[in-house]
Amino acid sequence: MEGGAYGAGKAGGAFDPYTLVRQPHTILRVVSWVFSIVVFGSIVNEGYLNNPEEEEEFCIYNRNPNACSYGVTVGVLAFLTCLVYLALDVYFPQISSVKDRKKAVLSDIGVSAFWAFFWFVGFCFLANQWQVSKPKDNPLNEGTDAARAAIAFSFFSIFTWAGQAVLAFQRYQIGADSALFSQDYMDPSQDSSMPYAPYVEPSAGSDPTGMGGTYQHPANAFDAEPQGYQSQGY
């Protein structure tokens, strides 16, 4: 993983798609995006059955409309979430503020863990309703492959989203690279708590400017000895 602030280099560099697609969290987002399409696509296309004796369609999962609605809703929202965070992955290296990067990574941790939990609930819900479904409701076994696919990819999505949360936490642990970023640095000349320039101890040598060296009196300033009285000739 790249050095820098929260797993990305210094802001302002050129966009590198090759580096983007090689990042583990970006790969997992794409995989999660595909899985979400499989889940809600399978339910929308083949998750509702027609019975000649009934006017309305019913959900293939034990005739429970909540099961189909849950799978479609979670799949669509997860699909949109993947798109949002894929866009964030593209924009993330351009974020110059360390605090903004921190917020983005923390949101990634929370959202990824949230979706891992909801996919776990969805897998358990769909699997349970499929298990208790009555064969007489679907004597021709229509849509059974799609129903099983939705359950399977709900299960796989648990791990892809949990993996995103783990990778985001690792990026959070990296933190800010002090060599490239500093969020607490203040220019001493702009620091109001330091009104005066710091004292610099003068050097022992001569000071050609006369500003900081030690004072040296002239060599003959006080060395002249008093001379005796000399009479004046008149």
Curated annotation (Swiss-Prot):
Residues 20-173 form the MARVEL domain. Pfam families: MARVEL. Nervous system (at protein level). Residues 1-23, 93-104, 170-234 are cytoplasmic. Coiled coil: none annotated. Keywords: Acetylation, Cytoplasmic vesicle, Membrane, Synapse, Transmembrane, Transmembrane helix. Its main location: membrane. One of its GO terms (biological process) is cellular response to leukemia inhibitory factor. GO terms for cellular component: melanosome; neuromuscular junction; Schaffer collateral - CA1 synapse; synaptic vesicle; synaptic vesicle membrane; terminal bouton. Residues 201-234 are annotated as: Disordered. InterPro entries: Marvel, Synaptogyrin. The chain crosses the membrane at residues 24-44, 72-92, 105-125, 149-169. Residues 45-71, 126-148 are lumenal. The modification N-acetylmethionine is found at M1. It is found in: Cytoplasmic vesicle, Secretory vesicle, Synaptic vesicle membrane; Melanosome. It is a multi-pass membrane protein. May play a role in regulated exocytosis. Modulates the localization of synaptophysin/SYP into synaptic-like microvesicles and may therefore play a role in synaptic-like microvesicle formation and/or maturation. Involved in the regulation of short-term and long-term synaptic plasticity. Belongs to the synaptogyrin family. This is Synaptogyrin-1. It comes from Rattus norvegicus (Rat). The lineage of its organism: Eukaryota, Metazoa, Chordata, Craniata, Vertebrata.
